[in-house]
Amino acid sequence: MQPWSSVPVPKVPGTARPLRLFDTAAGEVRPVTAGRTARMYVCGITPYDATHLGHAATYLAFDLVHRIWLDNGHDVHYVQNVTDIDDPLLERANRDNEDWVVLAMRETALFREDMEALRVVPPTDFIGAVESIPEIEEAVGKLLASGAAYRVDDDEYPDVYFRHSATGRFGYESNYDEATMLDLSAERGGDPDRKGKEHPLDALLWRMARDGEPSWESELGPGRPGWHLECSVIALNRLGMGFDVQGGGSDLAFPHHEFSAAHAEALAGDHPFARHYCHAGMIGLDGEKMSKSKGNLVFVSRLRGDRVDPMAIRLALLDGHYRSDRSWTADALTKGSARLARWREAVALEAGPSAEPVVERLRDRLSDDLDTERALLAVDAWVDEALCRRGGDAEAPAAIRDAVDGLLGVQL
């Protein structure tokens, strides 16, 4: 798959700050100690409802990580997948009497357009699950051979499952107890009640072909891959073990990221899969959970269709800590639009207060676990002074414009 078009990132003068992020596995904010090439994997969309604001908020958070690494002089190898074969996609296609391939292609194209409009720096590798099936088949074979996987006792559908206990470390990423894991597995695409499994938590690796479902010929038998293993294989084969950041929404901490790590660690015989597990909060609507079942998803494309400036959307989503569950409201968008207008007015002036202390504060805030709320306030303070015609630095408006673009991704 091809990602969206590249987004220019201005170089910001001054001294960058090393990044610190909350690590779900450690339960604390820790330094992210990347090498010359920083490596990140962020779980992508299942392309049937793209791009809602929950998606957007997650990818904006990890876009900031990308930008901070660039500011620190790192090369960045960023991998993002597309889950272009999975039960929710097939269910939507069946509901709408649409070919699942056509649906996935259309929604993936829409996602690319939305990401480009929001000025998200594209991944180095943008990889679909379908194109990765040969790699996934090979991985399932290795897990079976090592004893980390088994076939269920089912003559009709002898699906392949992963022994969750295979690495001896299962649970280290999410830190949930078994009862919580079982509840979340049932809620989030698992099948704890599947007959023939050795343990309710064991996860699907290869689903044998069923009537009416797409499948691929394989030495494993005709079928299709399980969700968690797709990300394990795509990340492992492109980034290797011990990459810097595994990212996604907080609903992916378990079971998805826990199993992705366990699968990869069983395959590699090494630990850890990622050195930082980082999760973004959920976005609600007017105080309620935003979900497909409630029918209250807000889509970036529809806002753009209503002529909302994508930079106002970006500012509205950045006005809150990325790890917090937040609510999208009309007031939030109004505030983002007003802020954007004031910032653009200020950087269009011939002069303003010195930009240097503002850029320092921006870097300080963003490097401290992506504290975007206080980063925006730092720019607001400069804008207030500039619009009051205080300060005579003729280079300041352009410097602020470039810093806001380079570090926050907001084009003024």
UniProtKB/Swiss-Prot annotation:
Catalytic activity: 1D-myo-inositol 2-amino-2-deoxy-alpha-D-glucopyranoside + L-cysteine + ATP = 1D-myo-inositol 2-(L-cysteinylamino)-2-deoxy-alpha-D-glucopyranoside + AMP + diphosphate + H(+)
Protein origin, superkingdom: Bacteria
GO biological process, one term: cysteinyl-tRNA aminoacylation
EC number: 6.3.1.13
Pfam hit, one: tRNA-synt_1e
Record flagged with keyword Metal-binding: yes
GO cellular component assignments: cytosol
Keywords associated with the record: ATP-binding, Ligase, Metal-binding, Nucleotide-binding, Zinc
Residues holding L-cysteinyl-5'-AMP: 43-46, 58, 81-83, 227, 249-251, 283
Positions that bind Zn(2+): 43, 231, 256
Span of the annotated motif 'ERGGDP' region: 187-192
Locus of motif 'KMSKS' region: 289-293
Alphabetized CDD domains for the sequence: CysRS_core (cd00672)
Motif ('HIGH' region): 45-55
Its job: Catalyzes the ATP-dependent condensation of GlcN-Ins and L-cysteine to form L-Cys-GlcN-Ins.
Self-association and partners: Monomer.
Full protein name: L-cysteine:1D-myo-inositol 2-amino-2-deoxy-alpha-D-glucopyranoside ligase
Organism expressing this protein natively: Saccharopolyspora erythraea (strain ATCC 11635 / DSM 40517 / JCM 4748 / NBRC 13426 / NCIMB 8594 / NRRL 2338)
